Amino acid sequence: VGSEMCIRDRFISFDMEREIGKDILQVEGLTKTVDGVKVLDHVSFTVGRNDKIAFVGDNEIAVTTLFKILMGEEEPDEGFIKWGSTASVSYFPQDNSAFFNGCKLSILDWIRQYSKDETETYLRGFLGRMLFSGDDIFKNVDVLSGGEKVRCMFSRMMLFQSNVLILDRPTNHLDLESITAVNNGLSDFKGNVLFASHDYEIVQTVANRIIEIADKGCYDRQGTYEEYVLSLIHISEPTRRV
């Protein structure tokens, strides 16, 4: 099978159940200490319609902590967040172990618990996009490989049809064809995306805004990652990695 066929077979498409309004997210003065280290220090930004924001910086824990606060999984020490009334959010965590460890459900029954439509035909449609077909869907999720678990998480995310996607390094454990499918799906998505990734191509292709979580506050620039790096060079600041 040629690479083009492999890329086509892995089909990721994020649809929205409803359009998003003008006011999406306000983040004001977020401060958070983790294990004695201040990872967020008065971080403030707002998210507008059509924003696809890549969060970058040297401290991965800072971005993961920010995403957990946005999802209500952690509380900030200071500051607040306010989601718009029309925002519906799906979250792809960096650590998905809580979804699978000790779970004795089949892939089909695992995805069924997140769906309004529980029919096998409907659910097979979402699983099939991530190459779960035939008897694959009856495999227990607790024995899946890292890549298979990531594919399950993407099936779940597509199922929700949210208008805001938050993804924390979603391409870990994926092969090149699957990464390309993720890139295409996020690029084509009509809603908002807040994400972090080690994959340069996804950051460069998907993001139209870059927010770097700094030691104090954050740096916020419109444009691609390449434009962001060039702006840092222009003002003689050290180039920061994704």
Regions found by a protein language model. Give the residues of each.
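Single conserved hydrophobic/aromatic residue that forms the stacking wall/gate
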Residues: 1-7, 233-242
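Short, flexible cytosolic linker that couples an ABC transmembrane/permease module to its adjacent nucleotide-binding
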Residues: 4, 8-18
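ABC ATP-binding cassette signature C-motif
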Residues: 17-236, 240
